[in-house]
Each structure stands twice: as C-alpha cells, then as structure tokens.
Amino acid sequence: MVVGRAIDKFKNLPEKDKHKYFSTILGNNHFVLLGAVGPDYPYLSELKNNILKLHSWADRMHYENTGGFVIEGIKNLQNLKDKEEFRVCLPWLCGYVTHLITDTVIHPVVNAIVGPYIFNSTEHRHCEMIQDSFIFKEIKKVEISYTEYTHLIKMCSEDDRGNINPAIDSFWTRTLEMSHPDGKDKFRYINPDDWHQGFLSKIELASNPIPIFRHMGEEANLAYKMTGSITDHERSTYTTDVSFPGGKKGNFINAFEMAVDKVIEVWGRLFE
C-alpha cells in the first residue's frame, strides 16, 4: 500500500520537485509495484521447492547487505542509461527501495506493539494484516483488494507462460550476484522467472484478498479481515492508539505517511 500511495503523491509533486526521470518512473509504474514485492518474491518458490530451510534469497534480500544491493543496482543502471532496459529497471529499483524503506519505518512500530519478530512472528503477521486492511480503507475508501495491483504486476510478464520481463531477470540476477559475492554456491537458486510464476499462480488461485506484499510464504490460507470484522481491541491496539518506539502513542496512519514521504524523498535523491 505504501508504494501505491507514494506513486499517487509522486504524480502530484510541484514541477520544481520533479527530477529528469519522473516520467520514466511513472510511465512504467507496474515495474515499481513489481520491485516493491521483490524481496518477498522468492518465498513461495522456496517453499514449493523445499529449499527455504536450506537457503533463502528472500531472507538475504531482507537482512543481508540490503544497502549494498541498492548501490550495485545503481551501478548496473549506469550501464543501461542509453538502453531500453533502463526504462524498465529504474522503476523496478525504485520499487525495491520502497520495500526496504517501508520495512525500516514500519517494523519498529510493529515491534513496539507486539514485541520482536523472532519471538512473536504470528502476532507480527496478525498486526500487519490488520494495519493493511485499515490503511487500504482509509486511503481508498473501499475494502482491501489487490485487483488493480495484480493486474499491473501481470503486465510485467514477458509471455503467456508467466516469465518475468527479461530485463528485470538479468538486472535482478546480476545485482544479487554483485551484492552477495560470498553466495556463489547459491547463485543457482536465483530464478526470477520461477519466483514470478509462483507469485502469479498464488494470486490467481486466491478467492479472497491475500497478503501479496507481505507474508506471502508463511502460510497457505492467509486472508485479510474486512474492516467491519476488526474488533475494537484490534482497532485500538494495531491502528488508532498504537505504541510507537520510545513509548509514544499515536495513530498508525502517521507512521504509514512517514514511510510514504521518505519513499518520495529517496526517489527524488536516488538518481540526482
């Protein structure tokens, strides 16, 4: 939801704040959405192929050399500047950065509410899914649905088999290899085509809104609550009277908008 809100606000920036790649990012915003799912993408494939417990590229993208990935991604973009692939990979990297920023801003808030993830993973998932439903209704004024987002992500497919755009395949693979040089023995598990196909199959089979941007690989039958089903306790604890780091209290939407504003700031600075 952060990425969708950021795109909407990015469109309305004053002319003086629009950098030279403004039209490239917005003109291919389906690749921004794809990048925003990027660090979560491998989970479904890793579960299916029974390699999650052995090694996880999804975990590496979340917890290992995250800044290094962005740095190497920018280097790779420099080599694509005069090529058509640049118009695809730039918005994708903007989306990827969005995911990292959102985690940096939102996770400390969730930790303050339910405790550290390592000891409270179920509570984390429940808290974040309530927050997703709440924010979607607050911003969009309708119940949570990813129909629009999933349609846009399908536009990132290269063919009917569900293969990912080849520019993204190459860029993502190369950037992972460059930012994780000690993972050479696991490079064979880098497979954006398989990750993309696994994601598409998951959302096409779902009959209810599912957490496609978070927790994709954690449980088979997760589904969001509609806001009318959120209890008073859940609403207060997770959305309207939440605990912030440092002992402060406030509305979760303030943390959400902080993440959105930071994303827009970084998009503006990333390629100056």
Residue ranges and their predicted role:
Residues M1-G95, L100-E272:
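N-terminal leader/auxiliary helical segments
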